[in-house]
Each structure stands twice: as C-alpha cells, then as structure tokens.
Amino acid sequence: LLDCFRPGTCERLGIGPDDCAAVNPRLIFARITGWGQDGPLAKTAGHDINYLSQTGALSAIGYRDRPPVAPLNLVADFGGGSMFVLVGIVAALYERERSGKGQVIDAAMVDGVSVLAQMMWTMKATGSLKDQRESFLLDGGAPFYRVYECSDGKYMAVGSIEPQFFAQLLVGLGLSADDVPNQFDLGHYDDMRAIFADRFASKTRDEWSAVFAGTDACVTPVLTWTEAADNEHLAARSTIVASDGVDQAAPAPRFSRTPCGPVGTPPRGTTAIGAIGW
C-alpha cells in the first residue's frame, strides 16, 4: 500500500499501518513524504524546492552571482522520493520472503536527497566543497565542467575532467597547453573560463557538435526536450518512444531475460471509467 498523505492521515481514516497489518500482516506499507513521518516539519506542506532548500543541495545549484536554481523537480520528488521508496519496497519484498512479514517504509525526500548528496558531504568534510556556488569541481566552478554559450545562443556541455579528455578539449578548441593555465590551477580558473567562453562563442552549437563528434573530449550539445526526442543515440536505444502520438520514456533499466513490454497510454475520455461501471 502506497501512502502519499501527510503523516497521520491514514490513521485518521482508519487505514493506518496497524489497522492494515491486523488484516494482512504481510502487507508492505510504503509511506512517501517530503519531510518524513516525524520531526518538526513532518506535517508541514512543501514541494521539491522546499525539501531541497533544507538539505543544502539547493544552495549549491546555480551561478555564484545569482540566486540558486531549482533543477526542475527531478532531485527531491523523483530522485530522493520515488526512487528511494521503490528501492525500499523491493527490499521489503525480498525480506518478506524470509520473514513472512510486512513492514512500514518511511521514505522522506529530505533523507533521499541527503543520501544522493553523500559524496558532497564527504567533499565538504575534506575541505574541497565550500558553502559557495561555482567553487567545486562539479558545480560549474571548473572551466572544464560547465556549460558554454555558442554564437547562435545555444549551448555546449563540457565535462573534460580527466587530463586526457582535457587535452582533447583543447585540440577541439584550437588551443595548445601553452594557451591556457594549468588545468587544476584554481587561481586562474576565471582566466580559463574566459578563454573557453570566447572560443565557444565563435561557432554555432551544431558546428561545435561536429568538431567534437567522435572524440573523447566529453563535449556534447545541450538539447531541448524536442531535440532530445529526435536524438540519434536515444533513438537507437528507443529511449524515447511515441505511443499514440505521445513521446514518453521507455522503461529502465532493461532486463535480458524479462524485458518490459511496449509503453502504452491510458484510454482517453470516459472509456476507462465506463469499463468498470462508473
């Protein structure tokens, strides 16, 4: 049973964990909330952006001289919430095969986001992550791990972290090692960013895509939703499929022995409701 209400609602309705366990002790009662089942904010309203704001994650996303940026609702709602309750359900099902008993799962989005950010907490403990945006290797602070604007107003994503990939980035940009500061010289990152920004601004996104195609520079075009639906690689894997004229993601991950069936769309209008007699 999946409980998406605020804590205490199911109990008030007479369908709480204890009520259900009395009828079916094997039942897995999965509760997914933003704040969790206990704590000062447990019964407070919130959305993805609010849960992110309390975990430290939101403060780290965006440019240094602008407000933090909400990364859609991918991180807390889906990453820290849905995926963690799913893992919890699977784990509880596996454990039930041994014990024969169900249990209650408390999946809080603030907990899930914090687990997703464990590497960042480790980096903070070592002093390599600060309470400032664009000050870390993976938050856009490094010139070789950020997004650059092209001459047509579109963008290229650069992720040339390793030295061998960084070398190919320089080749693609028409630069030599002597033209830029040392890759990991933090004191000259502003200078390197300016050099890269100037180069990327000299060509269109498609021109840069052609330059870096087939290389290991880790440089790729930033696609819109519409463009992603027609992307060559995603099309080859059938990652985005059209069902009844609607683009949607195919199931993931993929299984070798028990593959998922085709993605469908729900019936339109009142067909589905009528079919069950409503």
Regions found by a protein language model. Give the residues of each.
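Residue-level detector of anion-binding/catalytic polar loops
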Residues: 1, 26, 218
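Rossmann-like NAD(P)-binding element
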Residues: 1-11
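Residue-level signal for nonpolar/aromatic packing positions in well-ordered secondary structure
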Residues: 2, 20, 29, 48, ...
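Active-site-adjacent "lid/gating" segments in soluble enzymes
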Residues: 11-156, 160, 260, 267
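A structural signal for well-ordered alpha-helical segments within the folded catalytic domains
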Residues: 80-87, 164-167, 206, 271
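Aromatic-enriched alpha-helical interface/lid elements that frame and gate functional surfaces
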Residues: 144-215, 219, 276
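Flexible, small-/acidic-enriched active-site or ligand-binding loops
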Residues: 186, 243-278
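Conserved PLP cofactor-binding pocket of PLP-dependent enzymes
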Residues: 213-235
